[in-house]
Swiss-Prot record:
<comment type="function">
    <text>One of two assembly initiator proteins, it binds directly to the 5'-end of the 23S rRNA, where it nucleates assembly of the 50S subunit.</text>
</comment>
<dbReference type="InterPro" id="IPR005825">
    <property type="entry name" value="Ribosomal_uL24_CS"/>
</dbReference>
<keyword id="KW-0694">RNA-binding</keyword>
<dbReference type="GO" id="GO:1990904">
    <property type="term" value="C:ribonucleoprotein complex"/>
</dbReference>
<dbReference type="Pfam" id="PF00467">
    <property type="entry name" value="KOW"/>
</dbReference>
<dbReference type="InterPro" id="IPR008991">
    <property type="entry name" value="Translation_prot_SH3-like_sf"/>
</dbReference>
<keyword id="KW-0689">Ribosomal protein</keyword>
<comment type="subunit">
    <text>Part of the 50S ribosomal subunit.</text>
</comment>
<comment type="function">
    <text>One of the proteins that surrounds the polypeptide exit tunnel on the outside of the subunit.</text>
</comment>
<keyword id="KW-0687">Ribonucleoprotein</keyword>
<dbReference type="InterPro" id="IPR003256">
    <property type="entry name" value="Ribosomal_uL24"/>
</dbReference>
<protein>
    <recommendedName>
        <fullName>Large ribosomal subunit protein uL24</fullName>
    </recommendedName>
</protein>
<dbReference type="InterPro" id="IPR041988">
    <property type="entry name" value="Ribosomal_uL24_KOW"/>
</dbReference>
<dbReference type="GO" id="GO:0006412">
    <property type="term" value="P:translation"/>
</dbReference>
<comment type="similarity">
    <text>Belongs to the universal ribosomal protein uL24 family.</text>
</comment>
<dbReference type="GO" id="GO:0019843">
    <property type="term" value="F:rRNA binding"/>
</dbReference>
<dbReference type="GO" id="GO:0003735">
    <property type="term" value="F:structural constituent of ribosome"/>
</dbReference>
Length: 118
């Protein structure tokens, strides 16, 4: 696997239509059908971190005397192609369309419902 160049403005950065704070639905994998909010986007790896999705458990040993071991659950990232933006009003997942508004600003909207995202 080639190394990922994480410098700003590099050609390896992938333009994603998903942003932090969007509500998304998982369309494939073990959590298929679940919805959650995007906590973080990783554009150089084309991955997203979604709240409550793709959780893994880790058993942590005690590091000091008198401390007990614990089990931690943590969200891991998903590939951006495995999620779609979810409309909470219409209860449907849809592709995203970027268009230029009358005032010249770029906006995002859902293709199925026409709902504006931002």
């Amino acid at each position: 696997m080639p190394a990922i160049n994480k410098t700003k403005g590099s050609a390896d950065r992938i333009k994603m239509k998903i942003r932090k704070g969007d509500t998304v639905q998982v369309i494939s994998g073990k959590d298929k059908g679940k919805t959650g909010e995007v906590l973080k986007t990783l554009p150089y790896e084309n991955r997203v971190l979604v709240q409550g999705i793709n959780q893994r458990t880790k058993h942590v040993k005690p590091s000091q005397e008198g401390e007990t071991g614990r089990i931690e659950t943590k969200e891991f990232s998903l590939h951006a192609s495995n999620v779609m933006i979810y409309s909470t009003k219409e209860k449907v997942a849809s592709k995203v369309e970027i268009f230029v508004d009358k005032d010249g600003s770029k906006k995002r909207r859902l293709k199925k419902t026409g709902e504006l995202i931002d």
